[in-house]
Amino acid sequence: MAGSLSEIKDKILSTEKTSKITSAMQMVSSAKLVKSEQAARDFQVYASKIRQITTNLLKSDLVSGSDNPMLASRPVKKTGYIVITSDKGLVGGYNSKILKAMMDTITDYHTENDDYAIISIGSVGSDFFKARGMNVSFELRGLEDQPSFDQVGKIIAQAVEMYKNELFDELYVCYNHHVNSLTSQVRMQQMLPIKELDADEASEDRVITGFELEPNREVILEQLLPQYTESLIYGAIIDAKTAEHAAGMTAMQTATDNAKNVINDLTIQYNRARQAAITQEITEIVAGANALE
């Protein structure tokens, strides 16, 4: 019985240590989430303005008939996917949702590796795709908790350049959209060619009229459209990082709660075993005393 009590006590101490670790990790993820949510709000100021400028310009007569490749649809022979995952685990179902969505998409729409190209952001996704022999053109590992544009700008620009050079004919970003601390949604968002423009961004009183573009519209579009697309992709990365921190916080909170439940169950077992041991000792003492009479 003494051995059993000792084993239960060791399990309680071990679980308490685990609970302290997961609780600390929960607090770290919570702090990262607050920073990421603020970064997302700050970025939206810039993103909203460039969306408004681009939408107004494209809905005006100033650029009608442009043959800019970022606006023109072409027969789709190959599709590019930017897939955003985390660099490590302990984030619940964050990665599994994205990877499942990508595998379903590839199974449904592509029969050969040459039909698609993956640009992977995050070690989990890179390792997953490479282990299955899938077509990973570029990858970025070790993304910061609050990634700057300088860190991701090169791979974003590379994706846009690959589209412009017709290495693929459409570009999507697959990521987890942050809804709140408990919820995220998988998004498969088309970035190129530029098709869907938010009508709310171009109200009648904001549409550009009576302006001239210098030196000419094609030069303006050549500068503006990549910047517009890159801002959307960067926004998706910030959004995904926010969802990752929320998932990490929730996962560690769940782990902490589970550890506390285990501790409670073990404590009950310990008390019962201790009570049984004491009862047995009393019984043995009484039996011994009776034997001496």
Swiss-Prot record:
GO terms for biological process: proton motive force-driven plasma membrane ATP synthesis. F-type ATPases have 2 components, CF(1) - the catalytic core - and CF(0) - the membrane proton channel. CF(1) has five subunits: alpha(3), beta(3), gamma(1), delta(1), epsilon(1). CF(0) has three main subunits: a, b and c. It is a peripheral membrane protein. Its main location: membrane. Disulfide bonds: none annotated. Produces ATP from ADP in the presence of a proton gradient across the membrane. The gamma chain is believed to be important in regulating ATPase activity and the flow of protons through the CF(0) complex. Belongs to the ATPase gamma chain family. The keyword 4Fe-4S does not apply. InterPro entries: ATP_synth_F1_ATPase_gsu, ATP_synth_F1_gsu, ATP_synth_F1_gsu_CS. PANTHER family: ATP SYNTHASE GAMMA CHAIN (PTHR11693), ATP SYNTHASE SUBUNIT GAMMA, MITOCHONDRIAL (PTHR11693:SF22). GO terms for cellular component: plasma membrane; proton-transporting ATP synthase complex. It is found in: Cell membrane. It comes from the Bacteria. The keyword NAD does not apply. This is ATP synthase gamma chain. It comes from Streptococcus agalactiae serotype III (strain NEM316). GO terms for molecular function: ATP binding; proton-transporting ATP synthase activity, rotational mechanism. Keywords: ATP synthesis, Cell membrane, CF(1), Hydrogen ion transport, Ion transport, Membrane, Transport.
